[in-house]
Amino acid sequence: MWKGKAIIKLAQAFPNSRYVGYDVHGPSVAQATANAEAAGVADKVSFKQLDVTNGFSERYDLITSFDVIHDMVNPRKALREICKALVPDGTYLLLEINSKDKLEENAGPMGTLFYSWSVLYCMTTSLALGGEGLGTAGLPESKLREFCREAGFSQVRRLQIEDAFNVVYEIKP
């Protein structure tokens, strides 16, 4: 959740909407709540501690996630729960690391960075809890499309955003 920064920016830009942020880490939820209060958007924004693989209690028009699915213990289940939480014409906006399918396609400075983060944080975080251990280079577009199809999504569209580091997808139930 990065302490609520994305949701706070959205609430400032689109004040007629309601926003809910979720994170498994309680102290991050507390900090995000304080940040929303300081930004003057606490009446539009709430933050809750939740492991999304346990499901959502509400349905949403838009769900976003930023650089987190590859870290999850069970990314497939998380995607299933996200799909179930969207209204029929809703949208899941997913930002992930711009990794490629083949090892040699990830070679170079960015690949070095991706694999370093994977080994030192992303994979170990997931594997320590019995997860899949995808890591930053473990969720290329082909695998994401496979996971989304399994989760019940009908459409995955890669948005045309030029960024060597990240990729953004518009995903529909």
Language-model features: locations:
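A short SAM/SAH-binding and catalytic strip from SAM-dependent methyltransferases
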Residues: 61-76
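Conserved SAM-binding strand-loop segment of SAM-dependent methyltransferases
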Residues: 39-52
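C-terminal alpha-helical "lid/dimerization" subdomain adjacent to the S-adenosyl-L-methionine
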Residues: 95-151, 157
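A short acidic, Gly/Pro-enriched loop at the edge of an enzyme's catalytic core
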Residues: 50-63
